[in-house]
Regions:
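Nucleotide-activated chemistry modules centered on ATP-dependent adenylation/adenylyltransferase
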Residues: 1-4, 9-392
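Short hydrophobic alpha-helical runs that function as membrane-insertion/retention elements
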Residues: 27-28, 56, 136-138, 163-164, ...
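Internal, active-site/partner-interface "lid" segment
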Residues: 164-182, 476-479, 505-506, 510-511, ...
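ATP-dependent carboxylate/acyl-activation modules
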Residues: 390-473, 480-500, 508-521
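Short, acidic/small-residue loops that bind anionic groups at enzyme active sites
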Residues: 113-116, 131-144, 487-509
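Short glycine-rich, flexible loops that bind phosphorylated cofactors or substrates
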Residues: 118-119, 474-477
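Structural alpha-beta junctions
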Residues: 52, 132-136, 243-247, 416-423, ...
């Protein structure tokens, strides 16, 4: 049996358990993918002491960085927020090597330490069976029914050294892209995990240096190639950034997520390099892309994250996602300066030959290429749907002749305002309403074309849902030519636009009462 061996509680217990339960020889396989907190030689020797007939460590750091993490960088790897997928990205590589070593060693079975409640069983077994449909797989944690306490007791009973204790029951998954912590208080979202006891590679943010550090990353076609001007292989660059970011407490995340199997859980993640790189990459990518490209790429990145998290590394659809992502990253070249301090990484400067940023256009500098006078028309069209949607609040035009009629309709107008009617009024009516404390918008006469808002414009654009147009009594008050003209146009446009129009005080009162009754009934 080829056992994917991490040296932790689960795989150490099962190395002994497989020998006893299956009477099988065990080859312990540890893959070096840049573990930050583990001594892999110590782990190899431990496997031999526990009875493995062979224990090997495969150096796959460059393969992991260049063929797996690289895809994640281009896709701004994340799942449901700030989990940068350190474990899911690594699992296909582990499964691939397990199948490969099993073939080399003549083993027909591989084993892993995943539980039946987790996602890793899907990622490892799905990949292994895709690569070799005939491989046998055993998952002792699913079979033996032991919890963490029982495992620690089993380890004590059989003399298996483990670092977990009752007071520190935490388990870890570790690679260069991040460290995942589980167990203890982490599993209960109601508790605050004691970071001082849990963190493996990051300083506590509050204990990190008070002075910020500027990290300059150079990117070529979406991938970082240099730190502060020094060219590096991707694996070495990631490991170097882990030290820088870890010192400043960058990348510590309490993350509640939805597992593939349907459970909602919390993990505690440390991913200093991932946090810095993705912050830089995302900002550079945004800088060289159009708005439409950025919007679509964000959607693709989410799909990428869900696909990897769910264990579908070899799904054909995943190839299509990567094809688009690779194409989009062809122009993502340049340098980004990232400021790191006390748990925070923030891109603060970007330079690239591929930018579509134009300083004169984007700033307050003078420019003949951008016609600012075109903005008014653009805004009117751009906000059309929003403005139309807000017209669900009805509008009413009030043009009421004689003070006597205005006084008679004061309560009626108050009622319209309470029903959220937006009130527009011609000059004398507006003046009366202002004195009575009723809010209304002044509408200028048709003859005053230069003054806005103008009555004719609003009638032409069918802006009113109700018109109360009560002319002055010719026997009591002389009517001007402008009033006669405006009144005539109002009535004509009301008929043309099929707008409710009232020309008498009593009808106006009755109509508003009916509107109130209908509103209450509704």
């Amino acid at each position: 049996v080829v056992l994917l061996y991490s040296g932790g509680l689960d795989t150490s217990v099962m190395l002994k358990w497989i020998q006893d339960e299956y009477n099988a020889e065990v080859i312990a396989l540890t893959i070096d993918i840049g573990q930050q907190a583990d001594d892999l030689e110590v782990i190899r020797k431990k496997a031999i002491k526990l009875g493995a007939i062979k224990a090997m460590v495969i150096d796959a750091k460059d393969e992991f960085a260049e063929e797996y993490i690289s895809k994640g960088i281009k896709a701004n790897a994340s799942y449901q927020g700030y989990y940068h997928l350190s474990t899911p990205i690594g699992r296909p590589l582990l499964a691939k090597w397990a199948v490969k070593i099993a073939a080399i060693e003549g083993a027909d079975t591989i084993a892993h330490g995943c539980t039946g409640k987790g996602n890793d069983q899907i990622r490892l077994e799905g990949t292994a069976l895709t690569l070799n449909p005939d491989i046998k797989i055993i998952a002792p944690v699913r079979e033996w029914g032991m919890g963490r306490d029982e495992e620690m007791e089993y380890a004590r009973k059989h003399g298996i050294p483990v670092r977990q204790t009752a007071s520190k029951p935490y388990s870890y998954d570790d690679n260069m892209w991040g460290v995942t912590g589980e167990g203890g208080e982490i599993e209960n979202p109601a508790l605050i995990p004691p970071l001082k006891d849990i963190l493996q590679v990051c300083s506590l943010p509050e204990d990190a240096p008070n002075k910020p550090e500027i990290v300059e990353l150079e990117f070529v076609k979406g991938l970082p190639v240099a730190i502060n001007g020094k060219q590096m292989k991707l694996a070495n660059l990631i490991l170097a950034l882990n030290k820088i970011g870890g010192k400043h407490g960058v990348g510590v995340t309490h993350h509640i997520e939805d597992r593939v199997v349907g459970l909602k859980v919390r993990g505690l993640y440390e991913a200093p390099a991932a946090e810095i790189i993705i912050e830089a990459h995302r900002n550079l990518e945004k800088y060289v892309s159009t708005r439409m490209e950025n919007e679509f790429k964000s959607e693709i990145d989410i799909k990428w994250g869900y696909t990897v998290y769910s264990g579908f590394w070899y799904e054909p659809y995943f190839e299509h996602l990567n094809a688009y992502i690779d194409d989009q990253n062809e122009k993502v070249s340049g340098t980004v300066k990232v400021r790191v301090i006390k748990g925070r990484a923030e891109a603060v400067a970007v330079e690239t030959p591929n930018t579509i940023f134009e300083e004169k256009l984007a700033t307050f500098m003078a420019s003949t290429d951008f016609n600012q006078n075109a903005s008014a028309g653009f805004i009117e069209l751009y906000t059309l749907q929003m403005r139309l949607a807000q017209r669900s609040e009805k509008t009413a035009l009030l043009s009421i002749g004689s003070r006597e009629n205005k006084m008679k309709l004061k309560k009626t107008i108050h009622a319209l305002a309470k029903m959220n009617y937006k009130l527009y009024a011609t000059y004398k009516t507006h003046k009366f309403l202002a004195r009575e404390g009723i809010e209304a918008i002044l509408v200028n006469k048709i003859s005053e074309e230069s003054k806005k808002p103008n009555l004719k414009d609003m009638l032409d654009s069918n802006r009113f849902d109700l018109i109360i147009n009560i002319p002055s009594d010719p026997d009591k008050e002389e009517r001007s030519d402008k009033e006669l003209t405006d009144g005539q146009v109002i009535r004509q446009m009301a008929v043309k636009n099929n707008v409710k129009m009232v020309t008498s005080v009593e009808v106006a009162k009755e109509l508003v009462e009916k509107l109130q009754a209908a509103r209450v009934k509704k």
